[in-house]
Amino acid sequence: MFQHLLIATDGSDLANKAVQHGLALAKVLNAKTTAITVTEPWSSVVAGEMALAFPPDEYDKSVAANALKILAQVEKFAELADVPCDTMHIKDQFPAEGIVETANGRGCDLIVMASHGRRGLKRLLLGSQAQKVVTHGMIPVLICR
């Protein structure tokens, strides 16, 4: 059925549940897995006077450290589930775009992700990343709650 799952996470509790569901499904299907976390471009996160206090190089260091932490957690989950899993940090992309492009580029046939993550009020303004992935992706998407 599915041979290569892309599991997207932002490290939130709900995303961690989606990671665990994706790994469990991959184990049953004996499918390949790739887990990613996507970080947005500095220019989309920092605006106005805040840009002076949080320069691009500091932002890059901060998001890289956070991505490493998130992916280390995925690696622990994968080890506990006894499922091999490649991990990737997708930099300087909007989450939905990074997820869809990575799934296409790596030949994935299912995307697994949480219904929502850490985005809070910004999510209400920009719309759900999960909804964007479902709308713009060309492969099935498993949304976990």
Q: Which residues fall in each region the model found?
A:
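Short hydrophobic/aromatic patches at helix-to-coil boundaries
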Residues: 141-145
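Short, well-ordered secondary-structure micro-motifs
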Residues: 18, 45-48, 97-100, 123-125
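Glycine-rich, Arg-bearing micro-motifs that act as flexible, cationic patches
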Residues: 110-135
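Aromatic/hydrophobic pocket-lining residues that form π-stacking "cages" and hydrophobic walls in ligand
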Residues: 22, 74, 99, 133
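Short, hinge-like loop/turn segments at secondary-structure boundaries
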Residues: 50-54, 103-106, 129-130
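Structural beta-alpha unit
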Residues: 76-111
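Small/aliphatic-rich secondary-structure junction motif
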Residues: 3-53, 77-86
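A short acidic, glycine-rich active-site loop
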Residues: 54-69
